[in-house]
Amino acid sequence: MWRVKDSIQESLLGIAELGLSKVVFRRVESQIDEPEESGVPESTVAEPAQVVSFSENGLRFMADITGGQKTGFFLDQRVNRQKVSEVSRGKHVLNAFCYTGAFSVYAFAGGAESVTSVDASKSAIDLCRQNVVANFASAPHNAEVADCFSYLTQIPDTFDVIVLDPPAFAKHQRAVQRAMRGYETINALALKKIKPGGTLATFSCSQLISREMFRDAIMRAAVSAGRFVRIVDFLHQAPCHPTSIFHPEGDYLKGLMLFVE
């Protein structure tokens, strides 16, 4: 795709309905090649703007498209955000690894009683606060800069709904076993903080972690936490991120919606 990026840019800018004034290309680090070995620059930007505003399903968001993670906003979670919204009415919600707070905004859109957003990045939390205020100015929103593992270990609070959407734990094959331990640990911590009858929406975006591996990690987490858990939905990347049948690794985003007793 990088070889034809100029053609892609020309085509996108030529679609009047999109109203684009610029195209930003970001090189995603590979599981195989290191950047210096690939001969491809880390990023190429056409007249970059740092923060852009846009809407998704009628909700307003801001994203840092040059300094943020990946493209600055995770469009692949669009459908899953709506599903979290649908279980949030009247609930106290924790959005862990919240990044810029898209799940938090959707939780309020679904009628959440309160939302707590936690991320280790201060710049992400700053945008998270702005995104919530842009849609629900007076909403009871608590945003904290913290390591999510430590936060879940230390807080006394419990929640009706918890969203776990961490960054990739395994970017290389040698990190898979450590990643599996990480998924088990963070999900066990979350399960201990969910009220009986609550919901956990948990994700892995590591393409090296299969759906079966992720499900096994969650099963072990449930045993460790001493919670009885039922799968109510299998979550995937949005249809705007189709997967070639010849490239199963493209089915990278996997998630579970769990009912926790």
Go through the PLM ranges and name each one.
Residues 123-163, 169:
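S-adenosyl-L-methionine
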